[in-house]
Amino acid sequence: MYTLVLLRHGESTWNKENRFTGWTDVDLSKDGIVEAGRSGRLLNEAGFTFDLCHTSVLRRAIRTLWIVLDTMDLMYLPVHHSWRLNERHYGALQGLDKRETTEKYGKEQVLLWRRGYAVRPPALAEEDPRHPRFDPRYAGLGPDALPATESLEDTLARVVPYWKNSIAPEVKAGKRILIAAHGNSIRALVKYLDHIPDNEITGLNIPTGFPLVYEIDKDLHPIRHYYLGDPDEIRRATESVADQTSARK
């Protein structure tokens, strides 16, 4: 049996402001820093250690990983960064307030944009300064790899090859791996590992700052998965993610 740990980054500044973030490179909020430290302590208390780590190229995930490794006294571990683990690109929604967007377009439409499988938000214009072609961290990628918007299906299409080519062989070699990533890149990987049907993925929400442990067999099929942490806190955090588009009261 192999063990893999998935961790959504701690709360970001735009999570706190309830904005669509996507590939925008915002940092952790003060609460997010606390959540990252809590994740490290939970892993320590449960007896986990790791051989290597994977994360995205966005600072909220990178900093979460740094804090976890520092808390666990594992700062020396090798860390692999890949844009393929980035958050889903939210296109022209990036930077917009989620509740205001819901009031403008309707809850059903925004739910499809946020949690649907194949629906893409409105795309960024190619000349928009938020487009990833203007970001030097993606300079080595061809234009076809740079999204102006993504559905979860698109996100899965870039996450799964990274899993198959870079992570799965390490898992099979017995490496103990921690992946610090984002809500939708983790949703994509969970969908793939658990064979969640397209029409059921809408209901899957990943809370910030709680380690998600997967026990998997020799063929990389999940045996079971569970969160580390207080069940009531995990439930409230998960409900909070689902409730981000509720109208103001």
Swiss-Prot record:
Keywords: Gluconeogenesis, Glycolysis, Isomerase. It catalyses: (2R)-2-phosphoglycerate = (2R)-3-phosphoglycerate. GO terms for molecular function: phosphoglycerate mutase activity. GO terms for biological process: gluconeogenesis; glycolytic process. Substrate binds at residues 8-15, 21-22, 60, 87-90, 98, 114-115, 183-184. InterPro entries: His_Pase_superF_clade-1, His_PPase_superfam, PG/BPGM_mutase_AS, Phosphogly_mut1. PROSITE patterns: PG_MUTASE. The keyword Isomerase applies. SMART domains: PGAM (SM00855). Catalyzes the interconversion of 2-phosphoglycerate and 3-phosphoglycerate. NCBIfam families: pgm_1, PRK14115.1. Belongs to the phosphoglycerate mutase family. BPG-dependent PGAM subfamily. This is 2,3-bisphosphoglycerate-dependent phosphoglycerate mutase. The gene is gpmA.
